[in-house]
Amino acid sequence: MSIFANTFNNISSEDRALMNEYFKGYDYRGASFTFLSNYIWREMYCLSWEVIEGYFCMSAGRCDAGERDAIMAVPMTKDGEYDPERLKRCIEIAREKFSAAGVEFALGAIPGHMVEIIENAMPGVFEAEHIRDLDEYVYLKEKLISLSGRALHKKKNHLNFFLRTYEYEAKPLTKDMEGDLLELTARIKEYKEMDPDEVDDLEGEYDAIVEMLDHLEDPDVYSVAIFIKGHLEAYAIGERLSDKMAVEHFEKANGAYRGLYQLVCREFCMALPEEIELINREEDMGLPNLRQAKEALKPEYMEEKYLMRPKG
């Protein structure tokens, strides 16, 4: 079942070029507003898309739930403009498509600054609910590099311990590192105690990482690999979100090395173009340990996310 006319399977180069016009057509400020951040998850989240009234519409629902939990992303523009009447017609047509598929309509993971755009187009129609678990953490690149200030003192101590204790080599990831990278990823996963939902999410993440490795040479994709004694022990992969912001999609490190997480984060930031000033390190998904780790790095701000359901 697909809610919209097209899926993310068998996408042509023309399709990707069209999508990029929309993903790059407005500063959405969310980590999911790139082609790759959707494409690499297509095996876990069944994605469908269609251009309606000039806006790019996309639905996403877990494949193992038969898309019954599907939501619609905010309609995307390629010219930086949102016309209230066209946007209203777009959403109304999309609601009809959800209804025809037997799926309750909702707009999900809506960046906070875009809620007003939808409400202006359709006043009184939707109820907006803040979803804390989906809020994204945005950091200053220079702070992640320097770890300066009292609030980051413990992180800086961990980094300094690593630098005093170990010799390492940092270099961009390449496809021929795939075997070592996947072995490290699987090894880290084995040591975690997780509930069944987390296990499923990590299985999906593993598949997404495999997909991402095929795109390391794509423009605006950035990566770093950390080698200790010739062995790959940490890596990070991300991409550009906007002129001054990048998103880090994946970060893995062997926890046996104190300070390695701080190091790989620093090296990833140092590998970014100079004009990148902000790093979106995505959401914590409501996982307590992940939330604690992200909060401990003292984000510059949170990119809030909302769920919008029709009233009544």
Segments from the language model and where they lie:
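A basic- and aromatic-enriched beta-loop-alpha substructure that forms the phosphate/nucleotide-
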Residues: 93-119, 124-140, 144-145
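Amide-forming acyltransferase catalytic core, primarily the GNAT-like/NAT-type
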Residues: 2-55
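Short, conserved active-site entrance elements at the starts or edges of catalytic domains
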Residues: 176, 180-231
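Short catalytic-loop micro-motif centered on adjacent basic/acidic residues
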Residues: 106, 171, 278-281
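Conserved active-site alpha-helix within GNAT-family acetyltransferase domains
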Residues: 114-128, 157, 286-302
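Aromatic (often tryptophan-rich) hydrophobic motifs at membrane interfaces
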Residues: 221-311
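Conserved donor-binding loop and adjoining core beta-sheet/short helix segment
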Residues: 34-113, 227-257
